[in-house]
Design a protein with these regions (language model features):
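Strand-helix-loop interaction patch of compact alpha/beta domains
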Residues: 1-39
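Domain-scale recognition of soluble eukaryotic interaction modules
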Residues: 2-3, 54-108
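Residue-level recognition of conserved beta-strand positions in structured domain cores
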Residues: 28, 45, 57-59
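Hydrophobic/aromatic-rich, well-ordered segments within soluble, folded domains that form packed cores
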Residues: 36-51
Length: 108
């Protein structure tokens, strides 16, 4: 988790750790495009064994879409969060925070 936090901080993101869930939260993430463009959210990434295993999806707060649709479900982080299950392709070729952020940018 510390290495992912170091990489995200190096590219300008403010982060917080939730160690009991092995989640690294990007604070004040601004959505760049799509129906939620310009909204600011928190994005949680599973980071327990980064860079060996990619995040299986993201945790988002506040909720942007209804739970139970498009692989979006309740998050263990609390009622204001939701979990978006999304596969991160090409992890074997690029195991970096930049690769994760490029992938997250396509979600919204």
């Amino acid at each position: 988790m510390d290495e992912l936090e170091r990489q995200l901080n190096a590219i300008g993101f403010k982060t917080n750790q939730i160690p009991e869930h092995k989640i690294l939260v990007i604070e004040d993430y601004t959505i760049e495009a799509g129906p939620h463009a310009s909204k600011t959210v928190r994005v949680g990434l599973s980071a327990g064994d980064f860079p060996y295993t990619p995040p299986a999806g993201i945790h988002v707060s506040p909720k942007l879409r209804p739970d139970g649709q498009n692989n979006i479900n309740a998050s263990p982080l609390g009622n204001e969060w939701q979990y978006w299950s999304r596969r991160l392709p090409d992890w074997g070729k690029d195991r970096s925070a930049r690769h994760i952020i490029a992938h997250v940018n396509r979600f919204f």
